[in-house]
Amino acid sequence: MNTKVSTAEKAVLYMFLTVLAFVALFPILYIAVSSFKSNSEILAHPEWILPREFTFDNYIQVWKSDYFDFKRMTFNSLVYTLVCVAINIFVSCGAAYSFVRGQFRLKKVIFVMFSSIMFVSMGGVTIYPMFDVLNAINLNRGLYGLMVVKLFTVPIINIYLVKGYIQSLPYEIEEAATIDGCSFTSIFFRIIMPLIKPIVATVAILSFQGSWNEYLLPTIFTQSVPAQRTLIVGIVALKSSGEAASSWNLMLAGSTLTVLPILIAYMIGNRYFISGLASGAVKG
């Protein structure tokens, strides 16, 4: 009897999770499938899921679009995202290792203060002062100034994950390296970094997703420099660009292309992502 109840509960749970997954994925699937429709079909029959005739013309038009430079925006997004990923990895790993193994006064107090500052979101409270400071040093335009901002706005969750992972490593490895004459910095780069590859992959994927999908700050910083717009900013701008605003086929095709890099990054680092996320959450 207990086995039957357990099986029934599992069946109900799996059905619920299946429905939940379908509800979450349906908008993405609808956009991807609709990107192969003609614009007239999208406007005439938006309720149709499958197109009557598949066409790749939308992707060709997006790539060669006169309304916005898709290739340039793709390049901007890649450069911005990769720089942000590098910054996140460097700051997260360096800060986490310093707080775990570093020996200095008021370490716990400094960590709490550091965490409190990082927890402040980049909302209306912080955007204006930050923009005003960058304006004073002439870095308030374009993605270069935004990359400087990223040095001081690393998500605290990344530091917590790396910190928990490092705490799970046996300290005897570092003691042996110290006896052999390795410095604090050498231990970090030659021993710790190779050992924490799974959590580094997790931080990289989370950073890639967040930076690639970021809209608010790139919009503010590239408002006066259209040539440095990212893909997300460009697609939203396409929606309000007069004649192009009715070109839903182009917007859907562009949106589908925008999602692909995130899917590719996750598929490449999936194995490390799961193990790193689980291990990094054990301690902290």
Task: State where each predicted segment sits.
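A structural signal for multi-pass alpha-helical bundles of membrane permease subunits
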Residues: 2-284
